[in-house]
Amino acid sequence: MNTFTTTAYNTLGEAQETETQTDSWTATEICLDFSMLYGYAETLDAWGRHAGEYGDRPAALGQRAY
């Protein structure tokens, strides 16, 4: 079973909230909700691979390497 961890960040790049799901679609919906609340959110799978993001990535987080 795969897990998806979504982390929300404020405009300073500070993590505000994290949630883990086993369903990729639920993780996508949570990512969108978090981005609306905090400005940016990204979802990673159990191996740390990028699975999605919404919002404007804060400069403090640096450039994402895919």
Task: Annotate each PLM feature.
Residues 36-66:
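Short, mixed-charge low-complexity intrinsically disordered segments
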Residues 13-19, 50-51:
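Surface-exposed loop/edge segments in extracytoplasmic proteins
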Residues 12, 22-47:
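A short, charged, amphipathic alpha-helix used as a generic interaction element across diverse proteins
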Residues 1-15:
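Short aromatic-glycine-(Arg/Gly/Cys) micro-motifs in beta-strand/loop hairpins
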Residues 9-10, 21, 53-57:
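Secondary-structure transition/turn motif
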